[in-house]
C-alpha cells in the first residue's frame, strides 16, 4: 500500500518529458491525449482499490477500458492535462502510485501471482515491499541510464520471467530452508537477449545487497549516450560475462560493508488456497463493471485476485467450488474465464511508437484460432516488443512494407520457440514478413505443425 505522502500526485503536468515519464505519463499518438500508468505494488490490489479504479475509469476515461500491462501495471488512456492531476490525487487517496511506473528508474517489481498461495510456495509480499523501499532510497535511482526491472518468482516454474529482467530472483523452499537463485542482465527490445545465471544457493538475506549492487553497476557503467544500448544487458555485453560478474561481486562486497537493512523473513504459509480460474482479459482491457465484479468477488468470497504478466488475473480461494460458481454465474466474469493465450500491446490504438494495429490481429486470432494449444501467442506493434514477442512460443513483431504500387502494408515478422522468460530460450525467426490479414491462417498452420 502506498500512502498519500509517498504517491506524489502532481498539481500540474510537468513540462519536462523526463519528469512526465517518472510520474507514469506518456503522450499518446492522438494529439493532446495522455496515458497514465499506475503500479500494482507487490502484484496485489484490494477490493477497495478495484472498486476505486472502476469509479475513476467511469469519471475520467469513460470511453476506454482499464488496461492491464505485461508488468503488473494498470493504464488509463485518453486523459488530458486537466484531468491528470485530478486522477493522480484520486490514485493517491486509494493508496496507489504512478511514481516510477515509466522513466529511467526502478520500475514496478513484478511478482508471480501464486506466491504464498500455490502449495508450498513462499510469501514474497513483505520482502518485495521492503526491497522496493530500500532501493528507492538510492541517490541515483531516478536518473539511471535506462529503466531497471526486477522480478520475483516463488518456485522453479519462474512465472515472473527472470530471464528477461535486469534482475530476477527465483525463491524456493527446499526441505525446511528457503534458497534463492539470481538471474540477470536480460531484456527485450529490438535486439533482445535473455540473461545469465548470476548466483545459486543464495539466502534471502543476500537479496538487498545484490539488488543494490546491480543498480550501482548499472548507474556507473550504463551507456547514457545511446538509449538503444543503455540497459544492464548492454553493460554485460560490453564487458563480457566474466568481467560483468566480477564488477557485480565487487560492488556487492561494498554494499555489504555499508550494512544494508535487514529484510523481513520469508515464510511459507499454510493457507490451503486453491487455484480457481484465470480471467483472460482481451486486449488487457477491463470495463469498470468487470473491475467492480472482481472487487465483489474478493470481498464476498475471500478470493485472492492476482494480476499476472500476461493480461490475465489468477484467482485463488480456500473454498474453490464456491468461488468458481461465483465466477460462472456472473456474466461479467464468466466471459473472461477462458480463451486462447493471446496477448497484444496497445499498438496503433494508443501508442505513438506502434507501426501496426495489434488489437485487430488479436481479435482475428481469437475468432479464427480459439485454441492455441496452451501456447503463448504474443503480438507486438513494433520492434520494442512490449508484448514479449521475442520469447513467445509464437511471436508477432510489427513491421511495415510497401507493395508494388507504393502503398503501406501492415504485417509482422514471425518468431517461434521462445521460453516466455521462464527459461533462457529466445524465439527464432520463421518468417520475415507476413501481412496482417494472412496471420490467422499462418498461426493455425504453425500451431498444427509445430506444437
Give the residues covered by each predicted segment.
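Short, flexible, solvent-exposed loop/turn segments with mixed acidic/basic and small polar residues
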Residues: 25-30, 62-68, 221-224, 268-274, ...
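Gly-rich Lys/Arg/Thr-decorated short loops/hinges at beta-loop-alpha junctions or inter-strand turns
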Residues: 29-37, 190-195, 273-278
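Mobile "lid/hinge" segments at catalytic clefts and subdomain interfaces of large enzymes
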Residues: 144-241, 390-451
